[in-house]
Amino acid sequence: MGRSFEVRKASMAKTAGAKIKVYSKYGKEIYMCAKNGGSDPDMNLSLKHLIAKAKKDQVPAHVIEKALDKANGGGGEDYVPARYEGFGPGGTSVIVDCLTDNGNRTFQDVRQCFVKVGAKIGVEGSVSHMFDHQAVFQFKGEDDEVILETLMMEDVDVTDVELEDGVITVFAPHTEFFKTKTALNAAFPDLTIDVEEITFVPQTQTPVAGEDAEKFQKFLDLLDDCDDVQQVYHNAEL
């Protein structure tokens, strides 16, 4: 069948693996969110947002339904959140969020990702103070002043509103996520929000190039291969 088929098959396998990783990640998050706060999205706003985000990322309905059914059944694994911090290649700062049913295993898996690229895992608080825990919304627009005034009128504690190349980005404390989203949807019902998430925003970025850039990409790939890793935040400027 030739070399081209082998390359295509490898590419398809990689794509399939990436999809399975995304489905697994959302399955865990939806299961835990429904188990802790109830499986009715109308009564559990965090779950409602998570399901909407999963659908936007093209997670199949059966994956979502299976996670909800599992939560309703009352059994299943008890995943707990785990957060690890450390220093990545090139002097970067990294936060790794996990959901795990075995903390010791997950710690060792994440630690090995650091070790394999000559990086160092740190203690709690070692780098998180260099990030702001923010709600971030991004959408197309030209008038950032109107957005800022609207949110302030609704008593949203806005951190910043940026306009760049026809894209508006709103930053607010992570505790203001639903208040910000509700205010935007109420004031601009036809607005399409392209990004809506709670994330860690680095206060400063660290330029990474050459060998350090290669190591950093390898580091991200290693973390992506860890089943328990849900999110990776960093300040690398690649």
Curated annotation (Swiss-Prot):
Cysteines paired by S-S bonds: none
CC annotations in GO: cytosol
Keyword vocabulary terms for this entry: Cytoplasm, DNA-binding, Transcription, Transcription regulation
Subcellular location: Cytoplasm
InterPro entries associated with the record: Integrase-like_N, TACO1_YebC-like_2nd/3rd_dom, TACO1_YebC_N, Transcrip_reg_TACO1-like, Transcrip_reg_TACO1-like_dom3, YebC-like
A Gene Ontology molecular function term of the record: DNA binding
Cell inner membrane keyword on record: no
Keyword Nucleus carried by entry: no
One GO biological process term: regulation of DNA-templated transcription
NCBIfam families: PRK12378.1
Family: Belongs to the TACO1 family.
Protein name as annotated: Probable transcriptional regulatory protein VPA0011
